[in-house]
Amino acid sequence: MTEEEDREAAADMNLFLQRRAIEQVKKSVSRTYILRDDNATDSGRVIGYYAISVGHLVPDDIPKVVSPRMTIPVFLLLRLAIDKDFQGKGYGAKLFVHVLHGLVRLAEETGIYALVLDPLNDHVRLFYEKFGLRSLPGDAARMFIRVRDVEAWISQTRH
């Protein structure tokens, strides 16, 4: 990333938290979870955050063996961002594991087939591939992982 791209990413992260996250929570469109640095002198600097919601996939997006005719409920990861000063220190993985645990809890209560997200770029795509996400059949730009695969990953890694 260039210095200019760094500044733009930081500004986007801050703008989302200051404006859009609050609006979306008030409208019950999504929820945003924040990870703070409790050791910071400025009363808990934001390390990173993620925003989630729920949605559905239409039959064209998923294999016919899953559902030949009906829509499938999914958990959407709308955003996951880490402050540039904290990148490369494992915080992205920590937040994503938190997302995965939330997915499993929600699936137990409501019935969710998968987590779906739209990676920002190839670097981000590689990050999610490490957790077992793959391209969504019918929409290669999106990625997904089934709940049962998340449950297996959690039990194998004991996260």
Where are the regions a protein language model picked out?
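Non-catalytic substrate-recognition and accessory regions of acyl/acetyltransferase enzymes
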Residues: 1-89, 93-116, 120-159
